[in-house]
Swiss-Prot record:
The gene is Slc26a11. It comes from Cavia porcellus. Signal peptide: none annotated. Residues 479-582 form the STAS domain. The lineage of its organism: Eukaryota, Metazoa, Chordata, Craniata, Vertebrata. Belongs to the SLC26A/SulP transporter (TC 2.A.53) family. Its main location: membrane. Residues 1-50, 94-98, 144-146, 218-249, 325-340, 395-397, 469-605 are extracellular. Sodium-independent anion exchanger mediating bicarbonate, chloride, sulfate and oxalate transport. Exhibits sodium-independent sulfate anion transporter activity that may cooperate with SLC26A2 to mediate DIDS-sensitive sulfate uptake into high endothelial venules endothelial cells (HEVEC). In the kidney, mediates chloride-bicarbonate exchange, facilitating V-ATPase-mediated acid secretion. May function as a chloride channel, playing an important role in moderating chloride homeostasis and neuronal activity in the cerebellum. This is Sodium-independent sulfate anion transporter. GO terms for molecular function: chloride channel activity; chloride:bicarbonate antiporter activity; secondary active sulfate transmembrane transporter activity. InterPro entries: S04_transporter_CS, SLC26A/SulP_dom, SLC26A/SulP_fam, STAS_dom, STAS_dom_sf. The keyword Transmembrane helix applies. CDD domains: STAS_SulP_like_sulfate_transporter.
């Protein structure tokens, strides 16, 4: 006994030391802290490119952050509070060199739905979303995102683009007292169109035209080559820089126009107004809030957030990982989806301590980052520093930014979110996928969570129907040969049973059958019971039911169940030959290039 205990202890120590060495290996540390993989190779060339990219993204995110705070129904400074935490956290934890985390149009829309325009609710939602996202990363639950199909995502983003864009019409036209619910918003906007402020409308339209022209200019800049004349390269660089920083330039132009009118004593525009100066205070997220009618407890706040605690973290993860994978594929590198969950989860958790609202990966700013030639996530340090500098020194200047200019920035940012091609593509490829797309798209105008839930439910029903009604290829002849074209799970066993019984036993002359199961990789207890029942039915009729091509795990399960009359053959030919011999028919010899002469039908039950 002592020797066995000693051996057991040595084995435990050996396995523990191996596990510890695996956890402490360089590759393990690099996986959890990706910065350790690229930092030792960092160069001056990378520093230059990262600085340019970080500056470009910073000039884009500052006006966008102010605008997205308006979409979220929060004071403008909360957009800037949300724009810098991700820059610093992602440098250490992110696996994509291109992704930039920060406020986005879609997340701002979700925040406006669930936080009642109350900053305390928004900050608490950030903290709880971060906890949920971090837990999903630690528990490797990222696969749950796979159940939200592409048509659902496209339906949601297209609806969000319309909701966000139309929601800014009131600021573009200078209208007041417009409700935030979409249908009421449409009604009251058209009802109040006669109250349009001419100054806001003209400035907003001019800003939109300028943004569009600058975007088209950037899209048409030819690739720069070293053999080009210096003046051509400089011109292309100047145009590209101007077009990339178009949001900042257009907002600055609008602010200068507004300031010029302010000096004369006449102001035709609605301005952003006072913004809290300085950096945000570092404090614990609010777990209760004092309202006009009393103090709201943490439990009550969680109840008020409701479905937002599921929708916001899931959509945040989905958007960020989709952006990361898209640019990783485009630029030929790999991202770790689970590590991305950890990065965005920790970003939101830490961001809640500086009054951030929930953030995610931004497609538009990530595109700017990639096109600027960023080499590592270190470009985010420059972006974050620029946002902090603007908070510390520029907030007094933000007073003069017209709301119409910010509305123009938002509208031009969300236009690409509406995917007009997806409807035609699905019509050509698989029309059934239009159902979850349209369900999501239409119901999102009522409530966002209903749209996402309906689309996901429809997609899941399609998936469950496919599992419960597997495609089955049946070969008719003296021997019924049934080939499962997909897996076999417990919802499908009754369908399989009905097909086999109706084709083999419920006929004038019962015949034997062969189940070809090479595509079945796993079964459960319900399937075992169903197959046992089939074997019993065949035995009562005096004919055989045999199996072929069972994979090792499935064969092991069926052998462990000790089914009476169970027989398995390695190939379909051998199984069919055995049954034919049992019937007293001539032996069936199959050469390599011969095919059994059966009438084949495809059943899609």
């Amino acid at each position: 006994m002592p020797s066995s205990l000693k051996g057991l202890g040595q084995a435990w120590l050996s396995s523990s030391s191996m596990a510890l060495s695996a956890c402490c290996s360089v590759s393990a540390w690099q996986k959890r802290l990706p910065v350790l993989a690229w930092l030792p190779r960092y160069s001056l060339q990378w520093l230059k490119m990262d600085f340019i990219a970080g500056l470009s993204v910073g000039l884009t995110v500052i006006p966008q952050a102010l605008a997205y705070a308006e979409v979220a129904g929060l004071p403008p400074q909360y957009g800037l509070y949300s724009a810098f935490t991700g820059c610093f956290v992602y440098v250490f934890l992110g696996t994509s060199r291109d992704v930039t985390l920060g406020p986005t149009a879609i997340m701002s829309l979700l925040v406006s739905f669930y936080t009642f325009h109350e900053p305390a609710y928004a900050v608490l939602l950030t903290f709880l979303s971060g906890c949920i996202q971090l837990a999903m990363g630690l528990l490797h639950l990222g696969f749950l995102l796979d159940f939200i199909s592409c048509p659902v995502i496209k339906g949601f983003t297209s609806a969000a683009a319309i909701i966000i864009g139309f929601g800014q019409i009131k600021n573009l036209l200078g209208l007041h007292n417009i409700p935030r619910q979409f249908f009421l918003q449409v009604y009251h906007t058209f009802l109040s169109v006669g109250e349009t402020r001419l100054g806001d409308a003209i400035l907003g339209l001019v800003c939109m035209v300028l943004l569009l022209v600058l975007k088209l200019m950037r899209d048409r800049i030819p690739p720069v080559h070293p053999e080009m004349p210096l003046c051509v390269r400089l011109s292309c660089g100047l145009v590209w820089t101007t077009a990339t920083a178009r949001n900042a330039l257009v907002v600055s132009f609008a602010a200068l126009v507004a300031y010029s009118f302010e000096v004369t004593g006449y102001q035709p525009f609605i301005l952003t107004g006072e913004i809290a100066k300085g950096l945000p205070p570092v404090r614990v997220p609010p777990f209760s809030v004092t309202m006009a009618n009393g103090t709201v407890s943490f439990t009550r706040m969680v109840q008020d957030l409701g479905a937002g605690l599921a929708v916001v973290p899931l959509i945040g993860l989905l958007e960020s990982i989709a952006v990361a994978k898209a640019f990783a594929s485009q630029n030929d590198y790999h991202v770790d989806a689970n590590q991305e969950l950890l990065a965005i989860g920790l970003t939101n958790m830490l961001g809640s301590f500086v009054s951030s609202y929930p953030i995610t990966g931004s497609f538009g700013r990530t595109a700017v980052n990639a096109q600027s030639g960023v080499c590592t996530p270190a470009g985010g340090l420059v972006t974050g520093a620029l946002v902090l500098l603007s908070l510390d020194y520029l907030t007094s200047l933000f007073y003069y930014i017209p709301k119409a200019a910010l509305a123009a920035v938002i509208i031009m940012a969300v236009v690409p979110l509406f995917d007009t091609k997806i409807f035609g593509m699905l019509w050509r490829v698989k029309r059934l996928d239009l159902l979850p797309l349209c369900a999501t798209f239409l119901l999102c105008f009522w409530e966002v969570q209903y749209g996402i839930l309906a689309g996901t439910l429809v997609s899941t029903l399609f998936l469950l129907h496919f599992v419960a009604r597997p495609k089955t290829q049946v070969s008719e002849g003296p021997v019924l040969i049934l080939q499962l074209a997909s897996g076999l799970h417990f919802p499908a066993i009754e369908t399989l049973r009905d097909i086999v019984l109706s084709r083999a036993l419920e006929v004038t002359s019962p015949r034997p059958a062969v189940l070809e199961c090479s595509h079945v990789c796993s079964i459960d207890y319900t399937v075992v019971l169903g197959l046992a029942g089939l074997l019993e039915d065949f035995r009562k009729q005096g004919v055989s039911l045999v199996f072929s091509g069972l994979q090792a795990p499935v064969l092991h399960t069926l052998l462990a169940a000790d089914l009476k009359g169970f027989q398995n053959f390695p190939t379909l030919e051998k199984a069919e030959q055995y049954v034919r011999q049992e019937l007293g028919m001539e032996p069936y010899n199959v050469c390599e290039d011969s095919v059994p002469e059966h009438k084949v039908t495809l059943l899609t039950a």
